[in-house]
Curated annotation (Swiss-Prot):
Disulfide bonds: none annotated. Pathway: Isoprenoid biosynthesis; isopentenyl diphosphate biosynthesis via DXP pathway; isopentenyl diphosphate from 1-deoxy-D-xylulose 5-phosphate: step 4/6. Belongs to the IspF family. CDD domains: MECDP_synthase (cd00554). This is 2-C-methyl-D-erythritol 2,4-cyclodiphosphate synthase. Involved in the biosynthesis of isopentenyl diphosphate (IPP) and dimethylallyl diphosphate (DMAPP), two major building blocks of isoprenoid compounds. Catalyzes the conversion of 4-diphosphocytidyl-2-C-methyl-D-erythritol 2-phosphate (CDP-ME2P) to 2-C-methyl-D-erythritol 2,4-cyclodiphosphate (ME-CPP) with a corresponding release of cytidine 5-monophosphate (CMP). It comes from Xanthomonas oryzae pv. oryzae (strain KACC10331 / KXO85). Binds 1 divalent metal cation per subunit. Its cofactor is a divalent metal cation. A divalent metal cation binds at D12, H14, H46. Transmembrane segments: none annotated. It holds the Pfam family YgbB.
Amino acid sequence: MSFNFRIGQGYDVHAFGPGEHVMLGGVRVAHSHGVLAHSDGDVVLHALCDAMLGALALGDIGRHFPPSDERWKDADSAQFLQHCDGLLRERGWRVGNADITVICERPKVGPHAVAMRERIAGLLAIELDAVSVKATTSEQLGFTGRGEGIAAQAAVLLGRIAA
C-alpha cells in the first residue's frame, strides 16, 4: 500500500559552553553561552533534519553528517537542512509543514520565532504558515531547567510531490 503522506519526529540537544550566542533555526541569538557541538550546534535545524530523515527512513543526522568527519566542523546547519530537503525531493517528497518546540530556560525564543520561521521557510521553499516555532521551559527541572543546555523537538508532515 502506498500513502501520499509521511510523518517524522526529531529531537536534538546540546550542552551550553563558551560563547556569546546560539544558533536557533538558522538565526544567531545573543546569549550568555554558546553550545558544545561539532557543527554550529543549531538544535532547531538538527531536530528538523532528523524529523525529515526519519519520515522516509533515511537514518539520522549523525549518519549523514558524522561528528567524526572534519568537513562538518563548525558547519552552518542550514547546509544540513538543504541536503536533507534535497534527499526528500529526489525521492518525490517535500515538507508540507513543520512544528518545532525549543526547550530551554534561556535564551528567550519568542522574540526570534518569526525570524526563525522565515529562515526555515526560505531554506525549504515552503510557505511561512507551514512552519511553527514555539518554546517552552522545563519548569527548572532537568538539564535545561538548570540552564545547562538547550533542546528542540520537531515534527514534520511530508507530502508527495505531484508529478
